[in-house]
Amino acid sequence: MQSLLSLQDISYAYHNLKGETPALSHISFEVSQGEFLAIVGPSGCGKSTLLSIIAGLLKPEEGNLYYNGNCITGCEPNDAMKIGYMLQRDHLFEWRTIYQNVILGLELNHSLTQQNRDYVLQLLKDYELYAFKDKKPSELSGGMRQRAALIRTMATHPDLLLLDEPFSALDSQTRLNVSADIAHIIRKTNKTAILITHDLSEAITLADRVLVLSKRPATVKCEMPIQFSVERHNPMEVRNTAEYQLYFKHLWEVLTNEQSVFQST
């Protein structure tokens, strides 16, 4: 598969009056077109920092990033880089309705066509938010707000999705169903996605490959390709397979030396 994104020797440190705190150290990996990559690692190891660098929100102190073969280090996202970034918090505007929130990216991109309006309305129906499209965010539960934020991310048709623990606000059952649905949509539309998560089960169930980071300053500790003999649309069926148990055991053993507690659902 063709590489959509390539990181080469990326390093980054935070600076303040007391000195610097190294966050990332010589990170290198590639993400292929249509691949779903999950990144796990100890809390505070720099996973979100890495995602911010990919999104162009932070500039690495060392190394380069390439998108479709073009160097994008320090560049702001443009039309050639169709990146959708979903943060841990929903960041919905309380004075706008849910529909007005999910079309915000289309408005900013001057691409609010009738076709895109119809696409957004279909997403609202698919995620059971159509009946709430005229409601304000304060009238929705945390899980519903997070689904609205995800629709806002998908509305601009990004080629690369950056997902920073997007399901963390959902209850366990909803999280299982929504995460499986999103992964199915991403694969069906051949989107490329990078998921940051603390949940090893989620990483194994959703991803084509899991990248494990060490404690700060983070380095790539290992990579694990993920394959199952069953369809992934049913998360509980996947978690009952022998492959899942082996992947989980191996990841847990790799992370044991990092002395970090991970969530398992």
Task: List PLM regions with ranges.
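Conserved ABC ATPase "signature" region
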Residues: 114-132, 184
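Conserved ABC ATPase signature
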Residues: 136-140, 144
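A short, proline-enriched helix->beta-strand linker immediately N-terminal to the Walker B motif
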Residues: 155-159
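Helix-to-loop junction immediately C-terminal to a conserved catalytic motif
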Residues: 55
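ABC ATPase NBD coupling module
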Residues: 72-89, 108, 235-241
